[in-house]
Amino acid sequence: MKNIIIIFFCMFMLMFQATAQNHADVKEIEVSGIVLDSNKDPLIGANIVVKNVPGLGVITNIDGKFKIKVELYQRLIVSYIGFESQEILIKDKKTLTVIMQESKSSVLDEVVITGTGEQKKITVTGAVSSANIAHLNVSPSGNLVNALAGNVPGVLSMQSSGAPGQNTSEFWIRGISTFGAKTSALVLVDGFERDMDDISIEDIESFQVLKDASETAIYGARGANGVVLITTKHGKPSKITISAKAETSYNTRTITPEFIDGPTYASLINEARITRNEEPVYQPDELYILKNGLDPDLLPNVDWMDEILKKGAMTYKASLNITGGSTNTRYFVSASYVEEEGMYKTDKEIEKQYNTNANARRWNYRMNADIDITKSTLLNVGISGMLKKVNDTGRGSSLVWNSLMGQTPVSIPKVYSNGYFPASEYNENYRDNPWIASTQTGYRQNWTNQIQTNVTLNQKLDFITEGLKFIGRFGYDTNNSNYINKLKAPERWKAERFRDSEGNLVFKRLNEEQKMTQSAGGSGDRHEFFEAELHYNRVFNKHHHVGSVLKYNQDSKIRTYNLGDDLKNSVPVRHQGFSGRFTYNWKYRYFVNFNFGYTGSENFAVGNQFGFFPAFSMAWNIAEEPFIQNNFKWLNMFKVRYSWGKVGNDNVSVRFPYMYTIGSFKNYQWADFGFNQSYNGLTYTSVASNGISWEIAKKHDIGLDLVLFNERFSLTVDYFNEKRTGIFMSRGSLPLTVGLYDGDKPYANVGSVINRGWDGNFSFNQNIGNVSLTIRANATYSDNEILEKDEGHKLYPYLYETGFSVSQSRGLIALGLFKDWDDIRNSPTQNTWGSVEPGDIKYKDVNGDGVINNNDRVAVGNTNRPSFVYGMGISANWKGLDASVHFQGTGKSSFFKI
């Protein structure tokens, strides 16, 4: 054994000596050079690397020059962003002059991100939309979701609030297809499920929307409502580059109701009273005093909108990006700040102590590092976070607006002349003194803190077979939110409608002062992700392009505090899935694609926990046919697409619906009439639904992609049809005789909705002299209908929601005004909501029962969600100077509430 070891040692030393001798025989030289553009200007930070030698490379200096030591007959690769790379063989020349040519980008070579990674747009067989990041960057909104409006085909959005920090739009991909628990899309940032609201636009490299089943099936149940893929910026091999940006915008109120002034209001009140044969409220001398502002305490004339609201408010945005790195280590670091000022006017004295306005501040940071561990191993490490502070008035913005809309201009002054605060005679929630509600009730603060970490390992496995690659991902996120409410109320007075003998006001105190109180709380969650993917891409005989992906994923989300004794919600929410994709194309002419997702969910009982969801797509690029290429050279791409797929949704409104829940019931009375004894016991608070399973969506998509006239004109249009069945809902048709109230009834898969529509976009590019002009537009239309819903018994067919859109608005039909008392007496009874007098609105008795009530409400208008969204823009570039304009709008929506 000893001899064997000695022999192996001697052989190793001989091999080492031979290798060292061979290496010494290779001549190493120093190569210097300069890298220039086509105008002979130096390119700073160009990359010069030795081919097939990881980590060996340099970067050009401020003069575009470089030096590097290489062996003879090695190759140098010279690259620079926006230019074509060059490969140079080193023979005996030691000084190089490299002239770089600008890369000729092509729409056909455009790369999009899909569920399985990067691929050329020409090879996409499903419905995928991309956002132009440059257009999002010029949006005045500090919120990414708001910036999407009218910029991305297939995305419908609606902003329901303008309050700072609470003004994020809701968005849906291709509209609403369910009335179940979840309608929002899956958002993935660098492959990890994240919230899109608080991402800095400055950090985004690419933004894609996956809309049909063939693109989302690989995500299983998570992709039922569409998928958004966001890729953040990464570093490039270059010297350190620092970029900073600061901007400000002035935001005005969109639509503010205009109210009449005090004298007009008083005159109309008198007119209404006289019409009803009643005494007028205001006498002529009081109208004179009111008109001339002679007694602002007893006869005020207050423009509440002007007293409470500013004309506009500022938004400030700033960002700082640092990027750079070497050939084997690259980094991107960013920080950003957004501040949205509030629209309310404030009490200057109180403002010295604390902030009562509605405003928001947000800080974002991000670090992405890419490390080439070996020639075939890439490690990506990402850390990002967000800190947000939202401030609001003590009563909250909604109650401030209720007060603004409900208070009359003549009821009370803003503040009495002696400094007393006027009390309102009405319900404080609706007709409180707006100045008190907005400035004198304390403040509310909410702090949100997010920390997101992720690691991705990309390992090429070409040593097994060419084109094989492994990708592993792990992410760990923490989210915490804390609030503090400091509330108070001032002493409030009412001035009597007379003065004392000395002419002083006589006051009556209606509300005692409430000292400031404090309440606080918080919530949080922890989210873990893991994914493992195996990719294979290969080209056979130059024409057969084959690709496949196998993916395993699991995630777990748990609330970290504020659980109390809530046992159900203390259990982590978990998902698990296995999915795959197979793709094939021949000569970029014919394409087929098959996907599947096998997903598990804890929301269903054993036997229903896993679902299989397949999808396929095909495409034909007619422009690649020889006849077209020979006779219609102006036709660059003419691709028709079709896809079909089935996807599942497990987002239900309750946890573990297949389990019974038992709770206590107190003071239950039973036995004969008049028996007053009560008992405590147990009862079902929810009944198990053992048979429930996945909400299923079957989706069809037909698409057309056109690129014409040497890529000057491009058009994409899709028609989609989706039928959602098995929607999870409570069994409304069960009668009360079964012993269950509405909140206790079991759930079942009994709902159905169909959603149809189209989306598309086009662009036109033209160079006119030194001016580069681009015209673009996009539009999305969707229309849904409820086919089945377990609503229970309705007295009249038109009261059912079935047959109408999800969230259809309903109301009474107005026929005009009551002319006189005879008109009232000869019309159906209409006193359900109060007494009726001449001049009031007359409503239609739809069911003909002689009474106007809730049974006469019918579908009116549309839903409050827009069914049609469009956007258009023009941009021009002249010698590096850019100018652009963007218009956006919505249609087929009704913004009212009855």
Residue ranges and their predicted role:
Residues 20-27, 117-186, 192-196, 214-448, ...:
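Membrane-proximal, glycine/serine-rich, low-complexity loop/turn segments characteristic
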Residues 849:
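Acidic carboxylate motifs that coordinate Ca2+ or other divalent cations, activating on Asp/Glu
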Residues 136, 184, 316, 368-377, ...:
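Extracellular/periplasmic, surface-exposed regions of secreted and cell-surface proteins
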Residues 64-66, 94-96, 690, 746-748:
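Short strand-edge motifs at loop-to-beta-strand transitions and within beta-strands
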Residues 1-30, 71, 84:
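Cleavable N-terminal targeting peptides that direct proteins into the secretory/outer-membrane pathway or into
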Residues 54-65:
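Short, acidic Ser/Thr/Gly-rich low-complexity loop/linker segments typical of extracellular
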Residues 29, 35-38, 62, 193, ...:
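Short solvent-exposed capping/turn motifs at the termini of beta-strands
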Residues 22-41, 46-51, 75-84, 91-137, ...:
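Short, acidic, small-residue-rich periplasmic hinge/interaction motif at the N-terminus
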